[in-house]
Amino acid sequence: LEEFMIEVSHVSRNFGTFRAVNDVSFSIPKGQIVGLLGPNGAGKTTTMRMITGFLAPSDGKIFIDGIDISENPVKCKEKIGYMPESAPLYGDMIVEDYLKYIAYLHGENPDEKVPLLCEECGLKEVMSKNISELSRGNKQRVSLAHALMHNPEILILDEPTSGLDPNQVE
């Protein structure tokens, strides 16, 4: 029997009378890398926001590692790192302070975790800069470090290469 990390079953999402997602079902096995493809307005971001627990489905069920997200959202969110397309970063904070704050919120040791993610995400050159001064690409790197901070089992990236310099896409 295959174990699924994400199961989406007959999920729909309405915004008033507008149906943004209509009866979507899919399963993603553990260890699988997938992409949601479709035109603008197809419901990709809405689907990701439901999987991450930021939005509740109007209909259907979502399971994260076998756990119903509607019944235990905290446990599900602990398993997910999410990098939204436009990350809600604190622009007036210095990158290093911001990442240490995120580490603290996740119960991680900032002195151990932040240097590791700084190296992994290519942030060495900008650690002492204000987030508001960063290029879009570097802001996305900070957002990725944020998403990775608690060693999530699932990493969800919404348009991770949008607006990046072609050399940064790696």
Q: Which residue stretches match the model-derived regions?
A:
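Catalytic Walker B motif of ABC-type/P-loop ATPase nucleotide-binding domains
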Residues: 155-159
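Conserved ABC transporter NBD signature motif
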Residues: 60-71, 75-76
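Hydrophobic anchor residue at the start of the ABC signature
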Residues: 144
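Conserved catalytic motifs of ABC-family nucleotide-binding domains
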Residues: 151
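Conserved ABC ATPase signature
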Residues: 130-134
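Helix-to-loop junction immediately C-terminal to a conserved catalytic motif
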Residues: 52
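Conserved ABC ATPase "signature" region
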Residues: 100, 111-126
